[in-house]
Amino acid sequence: PMLNISGEFKRDYKDVKKGTACILQRVIKLKKPIGQEESTLQAVVVVGGVQVGIPMEELDVLKLIPADKTSFWQIAQLSNDLISYYEKKGYQGGMRQEQAREADDYMKELEHAKLFYDDAAIEDYLQCMLLSIIPEKMAVLREGTPLVRVLKSPAPDMLMLGNDCLLVSTGMLTALDSEEELYAVMSREVAHYVLDHAIITVNKNIARAKRAQFWGAVADGVVAATEEYLYDRYDYYVPGLVFATNDVVQALVNDNIANRMGLDYSEKQEKEADHIVMNFMVLMKKNKDAMVSALSKINQYYQRNKDVEALSKYGAYGSLPERVGKLGKFTPLDEDRNYLKKTST
């Protein structure tokens, strides 16, 4: 796609002097001459009305300057070398379809267990916020616009699934105190989405049970959790009734499922998302302390509830304390009554 991102040269490059303004127009693929090792991917840059080709591995010669949310996320993709990654791995359309089917299966289980919190006003509020963050056009082809669903779960969680559904837990809405904190956490999920962290992670999670077998086991776990709960409480319980309990939530919101869908991001990916969002908050004229404030409140929830699994080395929030510390000093955001009213569940 056409990009048209403004920038300047950070150092002398061929006949172009350091500090020269330019426009990154697009990225193209060249035919590779026989015996030539130079990259076939080149950035087309316009300097003083003249086009200059820059191999993608030399793109760091440019300082790209975002003007809005779309150019910000496009720069994030280019700086992360995603285009070269796709050149080596391919776009993996088959795997993406498989991940979308995995996510569809997951949502069916959530629906069956009655774990969706249906509130049109809250969903509309969250959807509008997501649309204000996500780019209108990416530097690499991605289709569809993510849709928000609210999950009945006391734990603060937010997950972007492979079928472009953003799950936001009721626990996340109550753990945070302001719109800017929610904006920051949602921007982190958009960062994972834009940088394709889930597909990259799935490629690393090679050992995978067959889809039907995996989700069958998940469904069995939900039924077992439900029936154990009801047998303990009612003498005349008839097996087969689905009833939402904390055990059911744990059966459907856990690290095994996150791993299955490539959402067990590496510590490097988590820190990368943190860093990107801090810069994004500045560009969008938001309080960048909101990011650290939100992560700190999420961490407090898991520490308070002594959630050993979530805080373990391989858990979803295992690196949170260290990440919060590395993000530096911050001022926790106060309660925003308007936000609390909009997200009251």
Where do the model's predicted regions map?
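C-terminal capping/extension segments of zinc metalloprotease domains
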Residues: P1, E37-S39, V44-V46, Q51-F116, ...
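Conserved beta-strand/loop element in small beta-rich adapter and peptidoglycan-binding domains
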Residues: Y13-K32
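Zn2+-dependent metallopeptidase catalytic core
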Residues: D119-L141
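Catalytic zinc-binding patch centered on the HExxH motif and its immediate surroundings
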Residues: R149-L167
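Catalytic Zn2+-binding segment of zinc metalloproteases
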Residues: M172-L173, D177-E181, E189-R208, K286
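Active-site His/Glu-centered metal-binding helix of metallohydrolases
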Residues: M186-A198, E272, I276, F280
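Substrate-binding clefts and substrate-entry loops adjacent to catalytic sites
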Residues: D196, A224-Y265, R304
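Post-HEXXH active-site segment of zinc metalloproteases
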Residues: H197-E228, L295
